[in-house]
Amino acid sequence: MASLIYRQLLTNSYTVELSDEINTIGSEKSQNVTINPGPFAQTNYAPVVLESWEVNDSTTIEPVLDGPYQPTSFKPPSDYWILLNPTNQQVVLEGTNKTDIWVALLLVEPNVTNQSRQYTLFGETKQITVENNTNKWKFFEMFRSSVSAEFQHKRTLTSDTKLAGFLKFYNSVWTFYGETPHATTDYSSTSNLSEVETAIHVEFYIIPRSQESKCNEYINTGLPPMQNTRNIVPVALSSRSVTYQRAQVNEDIIISKTSLWKEMQYNRDIIIRFKFNNSIVKLGGLGYKWPEISFKAANYQYNYLRDGEQVMAHTTCSVNGENNYSYNGGLLPTHFSVSRYEVIKENSYVYDNYWDDSQAFRNMVYVRSLAANLNSVKCSGGNYNFQMPVGAWPVMSGGAVSLHFAGVTLSTEFTDFVSLNSLRFRFSLTVEEPPFSILRTRVSGLYGLPAFNPNNGHEYYEIAGRFSFILLVPSNDDYQTPIMNSVTVRQDLERQLGDLREEFNSLSQEIAMTQLIDLALLPLDMFSMFSGIKSTIDAAKSMATMVMKKFKKSGLATSISELTRSLSNAASSVSRSSSIKSNISSISVWTDVSEQITGSSDSVRNISTQTSAISKRLRLREITTQTEGMNFIDISAAVLKTKIDKSTHISPDTLPDIITESSEKFLPKRAYRVLKDDEVMEVDVDGKFFAYKVDTFEEVPFDVDKFVDLVTDSPVISAIIDFKTLKNLNDNYGITRSQALDLIRSDPRVLRDFINQNNPIIKNRIEQLILQCRL
């Protein structure tokens, strides 16, 4: 089972980097599947996500990879990559605006000596010298800037995927150059981009520029496996303009019904209109200083027609994860300065709360199966004049981001008169051209959307899409469920969680590092520690239930469960008695602590025992066997337990959220290793992998086949002391083979000996791991 996971990396079905597989294992369950689609054209994939039920479609969601299309001549739109997929044609593409740009892509097969070939370019016969002494294909980009000039060789793309790209964007045409898998883009400027027309002589795909990262991936690593099959039939480009008859998708479906309640599924089209708001503060005095320019929440109310129904909608737009910039022109009172201005970019999010007066939102209290699909939108910044008393005004201009749908949750909006349950749509951001700058200052070439003039004169930005959810509503349509009974309102709990996170992180400076190291070196795990948390003994029963319930749904638990389900079957020959023994010892340690607490009843101890019993099973399935060694969960649990003991306001409601969050976020930089004889093979979550000898710590070539076999048949060990630390320790202090093996196995006794000897290298490594534990 386990070998299947890794052997798929080596088959022809698909190709991924080892880092991709490691990230997948550490985050969520995903699987690439190659499907034989049959003799049908795969031009337009259905723009819908299928769950246990389907979100019906009436609004087109733009596909990432649209095609393949037959060779044709047309004027491609701006902001779309043309992904060219030739077979053996010599001339791949010709593009010109007949004024200042003529560009042609020529395909040259591998192993061609220097020779002159005859090509027909733009109706003219040309002799061009080509050469390809590699085993890959080469795309020669030929260029001229006037009709009377000769073609010059401008760029070369050396490719083993035999794919090329062409894009019209921002007064330039863009192509790929370099060598795969590290090819990148470059451009040629033109004064008349809109008139550039192309003659494409090969099959091609169309990809939105917002998905340029996927285009880059295809160029460098090849098309997805579904596209590399003879059953994919190219169609004419005109198929993109086929008019489809709109189906009825704004519908109400009764899922189930009793005498008092019924379940209704609402499928709706949606148009979200929103705008940004900002706050610009100017200091008094001479009038040259601006202390703050920031984003503020913005409300917008509008009407639109949904399938013949007039809908009044309300949105509230807010931003999160703003980046603070500043500009200081000098120290004098007459020097222009902005102390802080906010910019949103890739690490930011935009939230849109949406509510309308339709039947779907009337009883939106008990909700399940919520799903949505939305298009993307580009938001461009405008100009803002800093009006100063004397001198030329600095002008902020430019900046743009694209918003991409990243999720939807339920929310509650409060006004002075009413509280409304609404949908909160979350959008991730990518930066776009042009960059922003402040005229007459040195601020230029920065990317993102600043808070100066984010709407750029637009009354609103608009996003179209659809959503669907199932509500439990009264059978009597005239009755409205009281909003105060809503199960979606969690403001108080969120506030407690926020306060608790801040308290946890501030406690880090107050906890002695030696105390944490001693605790981390005990055989401990995330669940058996509960019996030793003094502040939660009285609430052990409800707390244990809630923690297990929440952890079961966490991303870490899901990935561990899926991974170990396959690995444990394959590694059945590995003895697990040592791991069980480790768990029993850890349970006894913390049970002793709990028994010292006065006033704890037998029933509480029984609950603690039950929780510890559950932990035995979870510990066995953490990643694979640990063979008497310490793992990353031990350190996480030690830090968490120490902080919980010192925390002042732990409650049974907030603890499960903190436990679950810490298990997923603590120690993000992890590494794992397998050991065979005198050779160690180590991989980390960043995708780095290497092998080395135990005796000399000399690196040896990383054998993927051997790694596959070892993962199948051997325990996977947490690399508490990583290779870099081991090498440093050996170079500076010298360690025996026995010590090296114990450190590689993360033996707690040996680690404690090194720390008791005040070894700075080992101690520093443990401290670095503990310092990663932040919420």
From Swiss-Prot:
- Per the Swiss-Prot or TrEMBL annotation, the motif KID motif is positioned at 643-645
Q: Which cysteines are joined by disulfide bonds?
A: C317-C379
Q: Which InterPro entries match?
A: ConA-like_dom_sf, Rota_A_VP4, Rota_VP4_MID, Rota_VP4_MID_sf, VP4_concanavalin-like, VP4_helical
Q: Which keywords does UniProt give here?
A: Capsid protein, Coiled coil, Disulfide bond, Hemagglutinin, Host cell membrane, Host cytoplasm, Host cytoskeleton, Host endoplasmic reticulum, Host membrane, Host-virus interaction, Membrane, Outer capsid protein, Viral attachment to host cell, Viral penetration into host cytoplasm, Viral penetration via permeabilization of host membrane, Virion, Virus entry into host cell
Annotated site location: Cleavage: R230, N231, R240, S241, R246, A247
Question: An example of a Gene Ontology BP annotation on this entry?
Answer: virion attachment to host cell
- Region span, Spike head: 65-223
Where are the annotated segments for Spike body and stalk (antigen domain)?
A: 247-478
For region Spike foot, the annotated ranges are 509-775
Q: What's the domain of life for this entry?
A: Viruses
Q: Residue numbers of motif DGE motif?
A: 307-309
Q: Where is this motif: YGL motif?
A: 447-449
Family named by the database record: Belongs to the rotavirus VP4 family.
- What is the additional note? This strain probably does not use sialic acid to attach to the host cell.
The name of this protein is: Outer capsid protein VP4
Organism this protein belongs to: Rotavirus A (isolate RVA/Human/Sweden/1076/1983/G2P2A[6]) (RV-A)
